[in-house]
Amino acid sequence: MLKLSSDERRSLRARAHGLNPVVAIAENGLTASVVNEIDVNLKAHELIKVRVFNDDRDEREALLASICELLDAAPVQHIGKLLVVWRPAPADA
């Protein structure tokens, strides 16, 4: 999982403000296809929002940590049912 400084996190939160969620996680949770879709969107956009249809805050926190671990990304923000995730574009892109 990537680590961000508070200044980097603040800048990314500002950039993410106008974004719409590109992936939704429903009752099936973090399936392989959902992880793949998040990966595809991170490659395309670097910074994405993910909507989680789950009322348990602790489970949403765990989902954010799992996403970041699996995809070597950085958690930017968790507000309500929205997760903001960032991963820098590959150097060869």
PLM features: what roles do these ranges have?
Residues 1-93:
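Positively charged, polar, low-complexity stretches
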